C-alpha cells in the first residue's frame, strides 16, 4: 500500500472544503475498520483481543507496536521494511498477502490471483483458522490476529481487490480536484485523500450498530466479499476515473473533479463500514 501520508495542507487544497485528518488510508482507514469492529464484537471477544495483544512482545517488532487494536491494524504495513541482522526481509513472505489483482475487465476469477494462497482473501481465512485452533502457538496467534485485523481492511479498499494490470491503480496517474502532484495515482487517492474525506464526514462510523444491520452487512463469506469489492473497483473506482467505462483506454492522467469526488466518497465510506462489521463477525467466530 502507499505509505506516504499527505499533509493537512495538501488535503485542504485537494478538497477545497474542510480539513481532514492527515493520515492516509493505510493508517486512518485501517484504524477506523478496527475501531468499528471492536465496538461491535461480543464482550468476551474484546477480552480475548486484549489478552492476545498484551502478548505483542512475542512478535519481536518493537518498531511496530501491536498492543492495541488500532496499532495492530497497521502492524502488517509497518513491518514491511524490517530486516534481519544479515539484511534480509523479515516479512517479505507476506508482501503479496495484502491484495489480489483480479482483472476487472474479465469475468471474476480468484484462482489466478490466489495461487498457493498468496492473496488477501486466502490469508483472511487462514488467520481465522489459526485463531480458532487453540493448539496454535501464542506467537502465531498474536501474528494471525494482527494480520487478520489488517487484511480485512485491505480487502475493502477496492484497489486491493480489482486491477487492470496496473498494480491496483498505482500506474494510473490521477488529479484529485485541484490537487495534482506528479506522483499522485488512483491507488493513493483511494488510500488517502478520498478515504480521509469519506471517513471524516459526520456522523462517526465508530459506534455499535443494531444487530439486524450487523447481520445484514456481515452476511456471506470472504469470497463473497472479495467479489463485492472487485465489483466496486469495476463499477465505481475505475469507471469514475475513466468517464464511465472501467475498461476504456487509460490516458496519461485521469482527473477526478469535485462532482465525481462527492459522488464516490460515500462508496469509500461504506467500504470502511462494511470492513469493520465484517471484521467483527470474523473476530467473534474466531475468538468467542
Where are these predicted regions, by residue range?
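N-terminal signal peptide c-region/cleavage motif recognized by signal peptidases
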Residues: 19-21
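N-terminal, motif-rich segments that launch catalysis or mediate targeting to/interaction with membranes
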Residues: 23-151, 158-288
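Bacterial N-terminal signal peptides that target proteins for export
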Residues: 1-9
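Bacterial N-terminal signal peptides
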Residues: 8-16
Amino acid at each position: 500500500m502507499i505509505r506516504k501520508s499527505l499533509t493537512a495542507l495538501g488535503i485542504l487544497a485537494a478538497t477545497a472544503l474542510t480539513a481532514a485528518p492527515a493520515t492516509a488510508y493505510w493508517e486512518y482507514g485501517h484504524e477506523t475498520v478496527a475501531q468499528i469492529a471492536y465496538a461491535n464484537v461480543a464482550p468476551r471477544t474484546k477480552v480475548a483481543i486484549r489478552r492476545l495483544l498484551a502478548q505483542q512482545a512475542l512478535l519481536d517488532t518493537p518498531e511496530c507496536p501491536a498492543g492495541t487494536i488500532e496499532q495492530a491494524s497497521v502492524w502488517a504495513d509497518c513491518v514491511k521494511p524490517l530486516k534481519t541482522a544479515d539484511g534480509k526481509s523479515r516479512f517479505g513472505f507476506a508482501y503479496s498477502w495484502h491484495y489480489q489483482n483480479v482483472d476487472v475487465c474479465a469475468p471474476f476469477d480468484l484462482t489466478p490471483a490466489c495461487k498457493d494462497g498468496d492473496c488477501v482473501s486466502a490469508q483472511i481465512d487462514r488467520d481465522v483458522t489459526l485463531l480458532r485452533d487453540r493448539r496454535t502457538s501464542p506467537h502465531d496467534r498474536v501474528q494471525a490476529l494482527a494480520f487478520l485485523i489488517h487484511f480485512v481492511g485491505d480487502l475493502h479498499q477496492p484497489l486491493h481487490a480489482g486491477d487492470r494490470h496496473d498494480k491496483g491503480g498505482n500506474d494510473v496517474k490521477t488529479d484529485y480536484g485541484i490537487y495534482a502532484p506528479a506522483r499522485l495515482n488512483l491507488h493513493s487517492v483511494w488510500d488517502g485523500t478520498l478515504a480521509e474525506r469519506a471517513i471524516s464526514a459526520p456522523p462517526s462510523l465508530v459506534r455499535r450498530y443494531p444487530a439486524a444491520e450487523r447481520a445484514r452487512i456481515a452476511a456471506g463469506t470472504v469470497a463473497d466479499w472479495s467479489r463485492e469489492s472487485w465489483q466496486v473497483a469495476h463499477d465505481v473506482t475505475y469507471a469514475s476515473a475513466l468517464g464511465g467505462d472501467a475498461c476504456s483506454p487509460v490516458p496519461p492522467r485521469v482527473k477526478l473533479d469535485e462532482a465525481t469526488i462527492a459522488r464516490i466518497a460515500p462508496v469509500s465510506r461504506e467500504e470502511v463500514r462494511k470492513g469493520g462489521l465484517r471484521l467483527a463477525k470474523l473476530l467473534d467466530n474466531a475468538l468467542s
